Amino acid sequence: MKIQDWVTSAAIGLGISLASGSVLAAPAACAGLPSQAALQTALDSAVAQNNGDLGFNMWATIVANDGTVCAVARDSSTSLTSQWLGSRVISVQKANKATDFNIGSDGRKGAFALSTANLYSAVQPGGSLYGLQHSNPVDPAVSYEGDSSLFGTASDPLVGARVGGVNVFGGGLGLYQSGGVKLGGVGVSGDTSCTDHMIAWRVRNTLQLDHLGTVGGVSGDPQRPDNIIFDITQTGNGGMLNPEGKVGYSPSGFGHPTCLNNPNPATLPKVQNP
């Protein structure tokens, strides 16, 4: 067979494979991270627990250290239109932030974890990270391509792509294996941002990638170092405008607003030690 014919045949074969929705091999960057099936199981389990939610269906995404999307899942018992479609890309955005702005045990001063929830106050005008939310934008040329019937399956068109994005409300967490070694991030979206955080936490715990016992954080709870912080209070002496148009202040600098049916983050599982 001539080289040109071989290339043509290979291209046709690849096209047929993609069109049929067959599961392609996991990207090399995803080695050591959970499969789509494992993510799906963890998501279904997490959604069934008490998360202070509105009862909406969810999306979840795992992203590798280099930003490669490794797995995307949605509620396994429903149709595509049974959850917010926009939350698919938001879950990727959260996972990408969770890997891009978390540090593993190889960091100069060791591991340090910030959930997306920890960034809400810090990125407001006057906050220490103001402007971060505008960096590393989602790539629209990648985010919305492909067969929508495959969204949330093992053949989701986003798998293997680098989508980018930074999100600054609850639902994104770093993934850490034993010893505080960071493997990537997980992002969850589909309900209130407070519920998204709760479900992401339970997903990470089920996947056994919550080895943060020696990892630094800002929550003030060493057993949950990157937990959501509800410390925004009303003040007339400066601070940020909240949705009610009143001025609020986060003493920690990393607080997150409360949500409808607000959950109790202190009930979340403790992280594991190395």
Spell out what each predicted region is.
Residues 26-274:
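Flexible, solvent-exposed loop/hinge segments and secondary-structure transition points
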Residues 1-10:
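Bacterial N-terminal signal peptides that target proteins for export
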Residues 20-22, 26:
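N-terminal signal peptide c-region/cleavage motif recognized by signal peptidases
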Residues 9-19:
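Bacterial N-terminal signal peptides
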